Amino acid sequence: MLKAVILIGGPQKGTRFRPLSFEVPKPLFPVAGVPMIQHHIEACAQVPGMQEILLIGFYQPDEPLTQFLEAAQQEFNLPVRYLQEFAPLGTGGGLYHFRDQILAGSPEAFFVLNADVCSDFPLSAMLEAHRRQRHPFLLLGTTANRTQSLNYGCIVENPQTHEVLHYVEKPSTFISDIINCGIYLFSPEALKPLRDVFQRNQQDGQLEDSPGLWPGAGTIRLEQDVFSALAGQGQIYVHLTDGIWSQIKSAGSALYASRLYLSRYQDTHPERLAKHTPGGPRIRGNVYIHPTAKVAPSAVLGPNVSIGKGVTVGEGVRLRESIVLHGATLQEHTCVLHSIVGWGSTVGRWARVEGTPNDPNPNDPRARMDSESLFKDGKLLPAITILGCRVRIPAEVLILNSIVLPHKELSRSFTNQIIL
């Protein structure tokens, strides 16, 4: 028997995802047509022996999250439950706090997945590796170039046994080109080191004259408190993958992740990809169109376009490398490139909404998405354009490399600006 835990964080996280995270929790943001964590759940549900999927985070269990859980249980015929932390507990604190729920039924092992990663999730291969070794911790790793590796947790492995000999989270100097993917497979014994960290935190933080538990003791960071401490002790191993992988920290990385998932649909979900039909819009490359969307026959879509529920796309519209969210309207002859159009937004006739992609270097097979910074030397850096919820763009204007916060009605063109 197996279980899976998806760490979804909380509203104090995902600030780089604004203004998109104003409307829905970041883990529910649509990537390639479905909520971000649905890709995780689909992968977990395909592992033989999977009995339960647990979501752990600090979000309030509001209506969108509750509806998603109900729909996921029906679609995958698996218990999918949300466990809310009493406070933000870090990447390992929630695992220890809810250890009884995780270990209920005596699972052989349990997967732990961070919500903000895009991957092909080689979970079955990880399970095979785990069953050969039977060690407490198995990490999924991939490679990055020397410069970008400093932005991730870096792993030094024994190339023969794949034991993790050294682990450093975001080192200041080059350690290794093997990086942590944020996807793990733990044995039940893996919770014992978390207990040790909790007890040590309790001893360090407790004052002599303050009875009871120190509230900060429950905060446990898997990367710094567990992986770094146990590396080289024969407990942590790494499974390397050369499949797709990317973090989803910002809106720009969500657009890149959408492209990766759309390309995977050719093998995993070909029914989700739109096809050119007589009397329908022209489709170029991988495109997702929700069944309720209305798209004019003269529109040209793709590559790498995702169109959400209830979207209206008018005559002569050109869409490329973009996400158009629920209820948005693109009027006649608009052009949307490298952008995200928010829920219920309207782009007027002959308007142009365009951003600048921040993709990995295509000439470097180990390149990853750079950590996006909005500003450099006091200037807004070119990036994808984001229209927040219910933004109105008038006809015949240009919105270039800009971020428009929700409920704004513009009257002119903007370039390289954040419109508050």
Curated annotation (Swiss-Prot):
Question: For the region C-loop, what residue ranges are annotated?
Answer: 356-384
- Entry keyword set: Cytoplasm
Q: Which GO terms describe its biological process?
A: biosynthetic process
Q: Name one GO molecular function term.
A: transferase activity
Region spans: Hexapeptide repeat domain: 273-420
Q: Does the keyword Disulfide bond apply?
A: no
What segment(s) does the record annotate as region Substrate-binding domain?
2-251
> Which residues does the annotation say bind GDP-alpha-D-mannose?
85, 247
| InterPro entries registered for this protein in UniProt | GMPPB_C, Hexapep_transf_CS, Mannose-1P_guanyltransferase, NTP_transferase_dom, Nucleotide-diphossugar_trans
Note on domains (UniProt): The N-terminal substrate-binding domain adopts a Rossman-like fold and has a binding pocket for GTP or GDP-alpha-D-mannose. The C-terminal domain consists of a series of tandem hexapeptide repeats that adopt a beta-helix conformation. The beta-helix forms several protein interaction surfaces involved in assembly of the GMPPA-GMPPB mannose-1-phosphate guanylyltransferase complex. A loop extending from the C-terminal domain (C-loop) is involved in interaction with other subunits of the GMPPA-GMPPB complex and may be involved in allosteric inhibition of GMPPB catalytic activity by GMPPA.
Q: How does it assemble?
A: Component of the GMPPA-GMPPB mannose-1-phosphate guanylyltransferase complex composed of 4 GMPPA subunits and 8 GMPPB subunits; the complex is organized into three layers, a central layer made up of 2 GMPPA dimers sandwiched between two layers each made up of 2 GMPPB dimers.
Q: What is this protein called?
A: Mannose-1-phosphate guanylyltransferase regulatory subunit alpha
Q: Which organism is this entry from?
A: Papio anubis
